[in-house]
């Protein structure tokens, strides 16, 4: 075997290893944060929470304390509203006439809203793994009331077999091997000695 054939064989082997390693599924995927939202029945439907970026509007605040404190920290005026007719509590830029408003943190209640907030999530429902309950942490800041926050644990994601990816990986590897084979044959044909008559 000549020097160029060895290099070509070595390059083909490295390319095949690279293709096989790239075709393997990514095992270290992170599961999204999942919280359970109670419905009118006893069935629990999990929803995916998106990570929050720095809030710029009042609608992005989901608690009374963060809504009222936005006036001081983000230089925007927000009101925490309790609407009895719609049975909703939320943060808004301006008060509504049929809702009572809260503009001080000492008036904020720790009771969560009774109606679940609808989301536009397309995530499949996942089951929470059996794990010990995390200990709640108490967050306290000057001039506010104590609120107990329970951290949500991330459920493990079950990996499933994806037939389309498997077939695509096989086609990719066979295609790369065919290209390598024809390149090898082409280079081998160039190495022959041609004799003139």
Curated annotation (Swiss-Prot):
Changing residue 194 to A: Inefficient targeting to the endosomal/lysosomal compartment and enhanced myotube formation. It comes from Mus musculus. Residues 24-162 are extracellular. This is Sialomucin core protein 24. Keywords: Cell adhesion, Cell membrane, Endosome, Glycoprotein, Lysosome, Membrane, Myogenesis, Signal, Transmembrane, Transmembrane helix. It is a single-pass type I membrane protein. Residues 184-197 are cytoplasmic. Highly N- and O-glycosylated; contains sialic acid. Residues 121-152 have a biased composition (Low complexity). Sialomucin that may play a key role in hematopoiesis. May be involved in cell adhesion. Promotes myogenesis by enhancing CXCR4-dependent cell motility. Positively regulates myoblast migration and promotes myoblast fusion into myotubes. Belongs to the CD164 family. PANTHER family: MUCIN/PORIMIN, SIALOMUCIN CORE PROTEIN 24. One of its GO terms (biological process) is cell adhesion. The lineage of its organism: Eukaryota, Metazoa, Chordata, Craniata, Vertebrata.
């Amino acid at each position: 075997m000549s020097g160029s054939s060895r290099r070509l064989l070595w390059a083909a082997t490295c390319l095949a290893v690279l293709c096989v390693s790239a075709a393997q599924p990514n095992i270290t995927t992170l599961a999204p944060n999942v919280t359970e939202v109670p419905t009118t029945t006893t069935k629990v439907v999990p929803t995916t929470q998106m990570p929050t970026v720095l809030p710029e509007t009042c609608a992005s605040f989901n608690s009374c304390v963060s809504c009222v404190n936005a006036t001081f920290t983000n230089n925007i005026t927000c009101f925490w509203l309790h609407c009895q007719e719609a049975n909703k509590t939320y943060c808004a830029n301006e008060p509504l006439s049929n809702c009572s408003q809260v503009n001080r943190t000492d008036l904020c209640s720790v009771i969560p809203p009774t109606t679940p907030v609808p989301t536009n999530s397309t995530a499949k429902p996942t089951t929470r793994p059996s794990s010990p309950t995390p200990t709640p942490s108490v967050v306290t800041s000057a001039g506010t009331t104590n609120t107990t926050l329970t951290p949500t644990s991330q459920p493990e994601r079950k990996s499933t077999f994806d037939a389309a990816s498997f077939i695509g990986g096989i086609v990719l590897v066979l295609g790369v091997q065919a290209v390598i084979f024809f390149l090898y044959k082409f280079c081998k044909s160039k190495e022959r000695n041609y004799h003139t008559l």
